[in-house]
Design a protein with these regions (language model features):
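Glycine-rich phosphate-binding loops of nucleotide-dependent enzymes
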Residues: 2-235
């Protein structure tokens, strides 16, 4: 049984048909990348899965159970975490308060502050600082920490590299890989192709709301012509 199975979903914004018959899978303990140019439907796919913009048709199975058109709160309690695009930490709460507030949605167990701080020692150092006092990299660490506090079995990451310096990007990528090795399933939306293919073992490339290519990350990494065709923005 797959951790996540998306079958032929169609998602609309008003009358605009954004996601068109999209299917994908994430196996237990697997990291999968969702790639594509801006505006091809990557974030809408994430929003469809987590329940913010439910698909009109199609099935989404999480741990074998139908979640298409269920409320985000229900899906979260089942064990699906989200690190949203733009990080969206609470600016007027401390690091510690941001984390403990996220833990309220945990269905079972949840991560402890000590576990979060073990992965992100910088957050321990900054635990009394407000969210708006953190650097972009620290905010991303906090956003991932918030996503982990509900003890997810699947973590959705939407553009974690956005606006981060290369050194910080390296650290974030290593942490995500550590989480995957710990057994966490990951679906990663990312514009940074190199980072995404380093983390994920498989990839899907979207174009106009549909899957244009899928396969092992190594195949895409070694195919510059395909990258130019589907991923690189023309000048």
């Amino acid at each position: 049984m797959s951790m996540l199975e998306v079958n032929d979903i169609n998602t609309y914004y008003g009358k605009s048909h954004i996601i068109q018959g999209l299917s994908l899978k994430v196996e237990e303990g697997e990291a999968v990348a969702l790639l594509g140019r801006n505006g091809v439907g990557k974030t809408t796919t994430i929003r469809s899965i987590i329940g913010f913009t439910p698909p009109k048709t199609g099935d989404i199975l999480f741990k074998g159970k139908q979640i298409a058109r269920r409320k985000p709160e229900f899906i979260s309690r089942m064990g699906m975490g989200l690190v949203p695009q733009g990080r969206r930490v609470f600016p007027n709460l401390t690091v510690k308060e941001n984390l403990t507030m996220a833990a309220r949605g945990a269905a079972k167990g949840g991560w402890s502050l000590e576990e979060i701080y073990r992965y992100f020692p910088r957050l321990k150092e900054r635990e009394k600082n407000m969210g708006n006092q953190l650097s972009g990299g620290e905010q991303m660490m906090l956003a991932i920490g918030r996503g982990l506090m509900i003890n997810p079995e699947l973590l959705l990451l939407d553009e974690p590299s956005d606006g981060l310096a290369p050194m910080v990007l390296h650290d974030i990528a290593n942490i995500v890989m550590q989480l995957q090795k710990k057994g966490l399933s990951i679906l990663l939306v990312e514009q940074n192709i190199k980072m995404a293919l380093k983390i994920a073992s498989r990839a899907y490339v979207l174009n106009k709301g549909q899957v244009a290519w899928e396969g092992p990350s190594e195949d895409l990494r070694n195919n510059e012509e395909l990258q130019q065709q589907l991923l690189v923005v023309s000048a």
